[in-house]
């Protein structure tokens, strides 16, 4: 009662799921109490209500911390989503347990799928040989010789020829067809190898020819640059014979009025053009 007198206007609010706080006003109101005290039956109601309030206040200690049970109850009431989260977590745990316990089933499923896929590929690979020919076909020498001779004549067969050859060799038409397909593939592969070798030889020859042409081109470039070097050199000297000495020489030199000796093959002097200036007039 002392706490109720000192803390005037103290209100306690407890949050519920409906978000309607429960407010307890400990301050006594004068007007309604005065009105209720006018009648004797109201006094009994007021006294009983006061006793209930006192008991409630004794049970609730504001200063003490709430217990874990109270917190769980409050959180359970205040947060309706907690039930959903708990159910979701429970479902996750159950699925995890089922996954761990049923992991072998998943592996078995993967194994069966892998087996089925591998079986499908193996069936496709083996189907080309026919249903009866699951293993590699073993031919005798006579059968191989007949097939080789027939392939040399005709590398492809029509259905009638296939049936006739199959009956002759004691094979099925599918086996004969597969043998011809493989034989054509081997022939094509051999031809491809031959062409590859021929192309390699051609490449080697062209490489050698290219090297030779490059060498010749380098030599031609060197010869093209050589006249420029000769043009920069000084012209060669020439030896000229005196006309008087030529006259003294005799009749052997009468036919040749002038004689020029040149050390350079590039310089050629015309006859009579040089000595006409030096010869005296008669």
Curated annotation (Swiss-Prot):
GO terms for molecular function: DNA-binding transcription factor activity; DNA-binding transcription factor activity, RNA polymerase II-specific; transcription cis-regulatory region binding. It comes from the Eukaryota. One of its GO terms (biological process) is gynoecium development. InterPro entries: HD, HD-ZIP_Homeobox_LZ_Class_II, HD-ZIP_N, Homeobox_CS, Homeodomain-like_sf, HTH_motif, Leu_zip_homeo. Residues 199-220 are annotated as: Leucine-zipper. It holds the Pfam family Homeodomain. Its main location: nucleus. Residues 76-89 have a biased composition (Low complexity). It is found in: Nucleus. Residues 71-134 are annotated as: Disordered. One of its GO terms (cellular component) is nucleus. Keywords: DNA-binding, Homeobox, Nucleus, Transcription, Transcription regulation. Residues 132-191 bind DNA. CDD domains: homeodomain. Interacts with BZIP30. Probable transcription factor. Belongs to the HD-ZIP homeobox family. Class II subfamily. This is Homeobox-leucine zipper protein HAT1. It comes from Arabidopsis thaliana (Mouse-ear cress). The gene is HAT1.
């Amino acid at each position: 009662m002392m706490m109720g007198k000192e803390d005037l206007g103290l209100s306690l609010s407890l949050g519920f799921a409906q978000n309607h706080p429960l407010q307890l006003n400990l301050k006594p109101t004068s007007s309604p109490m005065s009105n209720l005290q006018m009648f004797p039956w109201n006094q009994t109601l007021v006294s009983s209500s006061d006793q209930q309030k006192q008991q409630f206040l004794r049970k609730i200690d504001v200063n003490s911390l709430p217990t874990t049970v109270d917190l769980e109850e409050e959180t359970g009431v205040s947060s309706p989503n907690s039930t959903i989260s708990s159910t979701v977590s429970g479902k996750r745990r159950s699925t995890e347990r089922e996954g761990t316990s049923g992991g072998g089933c998943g592996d078995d499923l993967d194994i069966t799928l892998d087996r089925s896929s591998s079986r499908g590929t193996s069936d496709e690979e083996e189907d080309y040989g026919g249903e009866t020919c699951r293993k590699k076909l073993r031919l005798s020498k006579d059968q191989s010789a007949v097939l080789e001779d027939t392939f040399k004549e005709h590398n492809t067969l029509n259905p009638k020829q296939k049936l006739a050859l199959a009956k002759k060799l004691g094979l099925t038409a599918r086996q004969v067809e597969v043998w011809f397909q493989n034989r054509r593939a081997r022939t094509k592969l051999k031809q491809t190898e031959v062409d590859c070798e021929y192309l390699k030889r051609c490449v080697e020859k062209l490489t050698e020819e290219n090297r030779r042409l490059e060498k010749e081109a380098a030599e031609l470039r060197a010869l093209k640059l050589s006249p420029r070097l000769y043009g920069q050199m000084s012209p060669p000297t020439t030896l000229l014979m005196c006309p008087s000495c030529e006259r003294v020489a005799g009749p052997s030199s009468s036919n040749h009025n002038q004689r020029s000796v040149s050390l350079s093959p590039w310089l050629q002097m015309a006859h009579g053009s040089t000595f006409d200036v030096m010869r005296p007039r008669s």
